[in-house]
């Protein structure tokens, strides 16, 4: 079976792995000059590794981790301490510390009751909200709890949390930074289904909330092993190749895709396959689908989905920003030092950040240089129209507010990557509009983390969607045979 995949992000790559494993001929096309989609990275003219965003690998990414083990990339993950660290103004540190001799859900209870990020009243109200949630049922009946959680898509997490006795302090100081990190929108605008799904996964498995970062850039330490794997099994990759048009015929009420018109420089190439997979993000699939296909609700509903803007900022320093205690350590450049983990904050426009020179040193640590902070500005709306230099200075000012001791360090380099449309907006009531991977057209399938799957728009969600699409294609082929 010949398969043409449009989109070389994780969804398309995950589908390609299962398809080449089944012995099929796979060709992947992407308009960008690099693979990975929203997880993409590249090297600029000065040798700096630039990322589309900050990519964190939780231990509950079961499908992605299985993929990484298969292609030999799993050893490229660097596990971090099992804590979620919050940086508050003035360098005050709060933590959700999940390290506990007894596993889930008791390690989570310990983390919430011992955190300094919340007042005792907030902790009690937080316990009330979570204690009356489907998470309790999920300890014994995971699927039963998930059925309840899926039905909560219609309301925001903030509204659900308040209705169960949760406090404004918890929303502002803890849950908003986490919501921004997960979906790039706050708790007033993110679906309760989205947040509670993640909490359910964390509550069910002890290690689920523990995170990893890659040893270096996604291009080298995630995508290269995947490409090596699929290309060794006959897959081909075609970059800078934008699909201009989907060709199709309609006969006796049956629609069949017959080919793709794909740009090749100034020319256009016609590509034929037996089966086609559109592994795109929300704006990509909205541009790709023929207008006539909106007669089907499965396709028309896609246009009800929206994507959120984000800006990712990298700042290089001549010392170690997150080294809070020792001035001499902060200024030495012999080795990396500081907080080696993902960091959250409720006191800046970037909800989460890390020092890549410390947490992903293979590509980001440079001898004789210091921290490389990577900060994710969410919501990104106010920053899309701003000049990159102004954004960098804005972030630098907020870094100084979080880490006053960093004021005696110099910023030596900066970079800004803006995405006007990134993750799909997981707003209340949007879940019914997400399409299945199987479509009304027998030889045309969808993938991408906006498509139906329980996880959020994430690397794990993309992987699940790609694997579900590959399974649907293989089942369709078996039926046809």
UniProtKB/Swiss-Prot annotation:
The keyword Oxidoreductase applies. InterPro entries: Amino_oxidase, FAD/NAD-bd_sf, Zeta_caro_desat, Zeta_carotene_desat/Oxidored. Lipophilic quinones such as decyl-plastoquinone or decyl-ubiquinone. GO terms for molecular function: 9,9'-di-cis-zeta-carotene desaturase activity. Its EC number is 1.3.5.6. One of its GO terms (biological process) is carotenoid biosynthetic process. Pathway: Carotenoid biosynthesis; lycopene biosynthesis. The keyword Oxidoreductase applies. Keywords: Carotenoid biosynthesis, Oxidoreductase. SUPFAM superfamilies: FAD/NAD(P)-binding domain (SSF51905). Its cofactor is decylplastoquinone; 6-decylubiquinone. It catalyses: 9,9'-di-cis-zeta-carotene + 2 a quinone = 7,7',9,9'-tetra-cis-lycopene + 2 a quinol. PANTHER family: PROTOPORPHYRINOGEN OXIDASE, ZETA-CAROTENE DESATURASE, CHLOROPLASTIC_CHROMOPLASTIC. Belongs to the zeta carotene desaturase family. NCBIfam families: zeta_caro_desat (TIGR02732). Catalyzes the conversion of zeta-carotene to lycopene via the intermediary of neurosporene. This is Probable zeta-carotene desaturase. It comes from Synechococcus elongatus (strain ATCC 33912 / PCC 7942 / FACHB-805) (Anacystis nidulans R2). The lineage of its organism: Bacteria, Bacillati, Cyanobacteriota, Cyanophyceae, Synechococcales.
